[in-house]
Amino acid sequence: MDPFHERLARTGLGAADRYGFALAGGYAVQAAGLVERPSEDVDLFTAWDRRDEFTAAVAAVVNAYRDDGLTVETERQYDTFARLAVTDGVRVSKVELGVDWRANEPILMAIGPVLHPDDAVANKMSALYGRAFARDFIDIDATLRSGRYTRDALLTLAKRADRGFDPRIFADALGQATQLDPDDFAQYGVTGPALDKLRGRFAQWRRELLDDEER
């Protein structure tokens, strides 16, 4: 993990642990040993049934960063989502706090509570379904290549996390792999033949899903 991001995660989790927060997003997938790539921000999420404590949790995290000598600007804040811009005077990073569905208790690791791998992967599937960024393709591809999850297992996790999950819409999202600019992948070190293979694997999955829908 990037050292500055590690500082932000440790400090944020130290303040928000009592509100049920855990490390989420790409770093949670990395903590599970499924992928290794640069990450742009730190995601800290709590469970849906603790959403009433969200505002207090955000305040606690902001105060913890300031007590740690960091400067914090709240860029956005709603009932269940907040985006902070945090700087040490040299670097600036986003910290996103939110509320999400989870099926399992977080796992306590050296950095603090981290989403259970099943929940981290389910959230990544939701991200791929909803926005289909390059990093979402990279994370899900790495998850599949790890051998710990099959395509069917990922679909099951996605459906459990989102009752509205539609395989046909997901198939459309997979088509974005060939539409995204190669530079979107290059910033994470995926280029040339590696990118071609990634796109090929998602194209195959897309065809399988569409074939299943037609049967």
Question: What is each PLM-predicted segment?
Answer:
Residues 1-215:
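Compositionally biased terminal segments of proteins
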